[in-house]
């Protein structure tokens, strides 16, 4: 397998040999940001709830040969098995087919008879932990029923630094606390269904431009390395790492490392982010898998903490791999210590046992590569058996109910001057805009939803699923109006402005539908290369609104979008009587919307991002042109922790609609704030100390002769195997750089299996256990002061007090139901992490001595209750 994998590793080692101070300037004469090295890669120890699964993993891995361990770590290649990623198998020990990994965070990609769930951003708009869990559970059930072992989701990267970032909709919200809670609940739901969840994309994967070299070159950008996201230590901990800590604390089984570089070290071979932050500090017990083709070196990635290579080949279907045979070679010749591969296998099998795959597992009953019933066993090369590859198993169960419920619960009522809810007595209803109707090519007519035709219920890319059906707004509204004896007139061509004007002038209410789309960078739609070119509405949307508003004084605007759009030119027009953001609601789109429009569901959703007046209101623009010659484009996160509402607050800029805003058909009041310290001597912060045990090894390595290709094996072209062609390791590797001295490419300490010091901020999954001790109890009385029953989302923000801190940061929230006139006392607690800052010198969390305050209300800028926090440490 000819590839200079040692050479790549050497370059990686050299790039991290000397940690340097973060530098924001670039150019041929300027130093770039560097990522400090951290070695060796921590070995899993089965802490806490992982103990039993870890014990079982050790038992089975101890029986494995080196080749069998390697088989678990390496995918067999793109389109070589049924799933988008599938490892080798270990049939001798009962793992009769490889572990199947499959997209996506909102449903099963490349499949059929599955559900299409609301996107992550819609879940964030519900602010509902239970709904997040139930969605995760339902998705997990569907993946399990299709024979999938590893669900490639949910996502908290991108977090949302850029409002126009292409994949922000796959995640939840630019707020780390809101994202972290819903991220964790989704993971719990998926794994309670018996499927391994994957927290992705780790980390700082905030834009699509320049994420992959080949992709960027295809768009005409002359770069040779992927983008580097350059961030300081404080921002990393307090913003971007925060939700991943919640994921690890929730027991996530897998973490997917990202395409981008972090401080000029690739995400899947970055020892600082994988070894130190994820495994040593956060105590992650599961396995790290690469994003597809994000694996850039063999030895370098192995020593830096990567545990699984996906899809196994270097480029799709090239038959080459950094691992597979090469990983077997590297262990046999001592380049990679045996304990490192043992740890990879143990981590994979620990996650496998943790979620119960040994009890629930069935073979994949679908093919990602064809909808035909029969096909080649190995699709990429048309080899193996011609066999049944699709069993057409319907896995939808009754999940349409939770999809519809989340769709309605995530529908944000941004403005309402009394137009909503509709009474059902409207005689003439206009439904205007392409976004109300069907895609003329069919709901799944564009591969990976890579177009913007008809209503937008899902964005584009690998984070998608096939719709089993799609209820459009036009269909649902028409059914509702007709059942009420009314008339409905629809114009769904955005170029038919004169026809829209005619309908609007005759309608008692005009419902206008507009959208804005985005997605993954491998698809460009209308010149949007994944990321959006701007924040304007798509397909003449502004002109559609202008036309209708000028002819109808009761215009309701419904926005389906991946994130914020610019609404400043029309939102305050008196003829715009209501504005709804419906996000990406999935297959029940129209039904969910009608439930809210007609008052069957009282809206309770809150916007999970800020609506600014201009794109400039959000701060730093996307990096859309290379700024480092043909080297890695440098994306400096100079705004630090100040993104979204934190940025608006810092600039004292008033948004159109603030983070957390959302109206209801009733009203709520807040009163009687109470704050009580809970700290005692037993709750004092205790930095973790001590050291690990030595790196364990399991089983014997054997010799090269033990790992020759088995006699009689019919080798599949380009399939990634763990075996050797020859007992001559150099010949088996077929690497032109084989034989380099270790000192040329092995970082210092990378193979040290002796006991290692524990980090002060570590000690358990999620970080130091005392970070999660409750220090303060806060309560407030919430009253439904209106005439309609409904849910309210109380939000608690903290002012951390420091001179360079955000004005407020969200820390707690809930969603509570109140009948008209009913009062409830909402009680929550603040733990040490909620009140702490990351100290870059101490490398630990500290509660500063600056005075702190707590604020409670209905949004980030409607906080009627506030009080000083007692001093706790």
UniProtKB/Swiss-Prot annotation:
Signal peptide per UniProt: 1-19
PROSITE patterns documented for this protein: GLYCOSYL_HYDROL_F3
Known glycosylation sites: 71, 222, 263, 326, 333, 365, 453, 534, 553, 575, 679, 725
UniProt-annotated catalytic positions: 291
Keywords attached to this entry: Carbohydrate metabolism, Cellulose degradation, Glycoprotein, Glycosidase, Hydrolase, Polysaccharide degradation, Secreted, Signal
Cited SUPFAM superfamilies: (Trans)glycosidases (SSF51445), Beta-D-glucan exohydrolase, C-terminal domain (SSF52279)
Enzyme class label: hydrolase
Job of this protein: Beta-glucosidases are one of a number of cellulolytic enzymes involved in the degradation of cellulosic biomass. Catalyzes the last step releasing glucose from the inhibitory cellobiose.
Official protein name in the record: Probable beta-glucosidase A
Source organism: Aspergillus fumigatus (strain CBS 144.89 / FGSC A1163 / CEA10) (Neosartorya fumigata)
Gene from which the chain derives: bglA
């Amino acid at each position: 397998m000819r590839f200079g994998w040692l050479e790549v590793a050497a370059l990686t080692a050299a790039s991290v040999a000397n940690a340097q101070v973060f530098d924001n300037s670039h150019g041929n004469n300027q130093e770039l940001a560097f990522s400090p090295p951290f070695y060796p890669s921590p070995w899993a120890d089965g802490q806490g709830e992982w103990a039993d699964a870890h014990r079982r993993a050790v038992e089975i891995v101890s029986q494995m040969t080196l080749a069998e361990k390697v088989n678990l770590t390496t995918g067999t290649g793109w389109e070589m098995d049924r799933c988008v990623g599938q490892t080798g198998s270990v049939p001798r020990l009962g793992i009769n087919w490889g572990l199947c990994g499959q997209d996506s965070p909102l449903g099963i990609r490349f499949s059929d008879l599955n559900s299409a769930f609301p996107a992550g951003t819609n879940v964030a708009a519900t602010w509902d932990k239970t709904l997040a869990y139930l969605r995760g559970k339902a998705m997990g059930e569907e993946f399990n029923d299709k024979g999938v072992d590893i669900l490639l989701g949910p996502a908290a990267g991108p977090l949302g630094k850029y409002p126009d970032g292409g994949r922000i909709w796959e995640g939840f919200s630019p707020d780390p606390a809101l994202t972290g809670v819903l991220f964790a609940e989704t993971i719990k739901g998926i794994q309670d269904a018996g499927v391994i969840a994957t927290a992705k994309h780790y980390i700082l994967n905030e834009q699509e431009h320049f994420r992959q070299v080949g992709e960027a070159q295809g768009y005409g950008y002359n770069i040779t390395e992927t983008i580097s996201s350059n961030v300081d230590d404080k921002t990393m901990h307090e913003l971007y790492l925060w939700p991943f800590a919640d994921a690890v604390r929730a027991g996530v089984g897998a973490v997917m490392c990202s395409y981008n570089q972090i401080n000029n070290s690739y995400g899947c071979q970055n020892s600082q982010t994988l070894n130190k932050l994820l495994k040593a500090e956060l105590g992650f017990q599961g396995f790290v898998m690469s994003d597809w083709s994000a694996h850039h070196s063999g030895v370098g990635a192995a020593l830096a903490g990567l545990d699984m290579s996906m899809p196994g080949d270097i480029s799709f279907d090239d038959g080459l791999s950094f691992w597979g045979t090469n990983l077997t070679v590297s262990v046999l010749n001592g380049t990679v210590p045996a304990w490192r591969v043992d740890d990879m296998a143990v981590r994979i099998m620990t996650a496998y046992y943790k979620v119960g795959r040994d009890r629930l597992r069935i073979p994949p009953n679908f093919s990602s590569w064809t909808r035909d019933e029969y096909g080649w066993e190995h699709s990429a090369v048309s080899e193996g058996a011609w066999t049944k590859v699709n069993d057409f198993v319907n896995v939808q169960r009754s999940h349409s109910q939770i999809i519809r419920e989340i769709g309605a619960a995530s529908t944000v009522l941004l403005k309402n001057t009394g137009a909503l809810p509709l009474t059902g007595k409207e005689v003439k209803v206009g439904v205007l805009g392409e976004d109300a109707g069907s895609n003329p090519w069919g709901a799944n007519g564009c591969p990976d939803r890579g177009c913007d035709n008809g209503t937008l219920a899902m964005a584009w890319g690998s984070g998608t699923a096939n719709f089993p059906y799609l209820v459009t707004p036009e269909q649902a509204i028409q059914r509702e109006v007709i059942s009420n004896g009314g008339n409905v007139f629809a114009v769904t061509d955005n170029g038919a402005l004169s026809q829209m004007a005619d309908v609007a002038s005759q309608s008692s209410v005009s419902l206008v539908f507009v959208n804005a789309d985005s997605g993954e960078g491998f698809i460009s739609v209308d010149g949007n290369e994944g990321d959006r070119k701007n924040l304007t509405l798509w397909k003449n949307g502004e002109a559609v609104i202008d036309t209708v508003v000028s002819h109808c004084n009761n215009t309701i605007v419904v926005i389906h979008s991946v994130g914020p759009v610019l609404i400043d030119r029309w939102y305050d027009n008196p003829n715009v009587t209501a504005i709804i953001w419906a996000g990406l609601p999935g297959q029940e789109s129209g039904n969910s919307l009608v439930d809210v429009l007609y008052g069957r569901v009282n809206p309770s959703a809150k916007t999970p991002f800020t609506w600014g007046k201009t794109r400039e209101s959000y701060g730093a623009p996307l990096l859309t042109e290379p700024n480092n010659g043909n080297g890695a484009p440098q994306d400096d996160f100079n705004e630090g922790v100040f993104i979204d509402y934190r940025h608006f607050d810092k600039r004292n800029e008033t948004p159109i609609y603030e983070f957390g805003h959302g109206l209801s058909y009733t009203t709520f009041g807040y009163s009687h704030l109470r704050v009580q310290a809970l700290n005692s001597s037993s709750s004092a912060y205790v930095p973790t100390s001590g050291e690990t045990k030595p790196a364990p090894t399991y089983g014997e390595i054997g010799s090269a002769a033990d790992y020759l290709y088995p006699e009689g094996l019919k080798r599949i072209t380009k399939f990634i195997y763990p075996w050797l062609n020859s007992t001559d390791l150099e010949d088996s590797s077929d690497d032109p750089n084989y034989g380099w001295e270790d000192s040329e490419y092995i970082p210092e300490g990378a193979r040290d299996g002796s006991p290692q010091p524990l980090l002060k901020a570590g000690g358990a999954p999620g970080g130091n256990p005392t970070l999660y001790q409750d220090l303060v109890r806060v309560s407030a009385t919430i009253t439904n002061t209106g005439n309609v029953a409904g849910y309210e989302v109380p939000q608690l923000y903290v002012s951390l007090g420091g001179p360079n801190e955000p004005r407020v940061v969200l820390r707690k929230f809930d969603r509570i139901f109140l009948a008209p006139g009913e009062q409830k006392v909402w009680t929550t607690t603040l733990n040490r992490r909620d009140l702490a800052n990351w100290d870059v010198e101490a490398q630990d969390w500290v509660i500063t001595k600056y005075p702190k305050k707590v604020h409670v209300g209905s949004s980030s800028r409607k906080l009627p209750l506030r009080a000083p926090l007692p001093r706790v440490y």
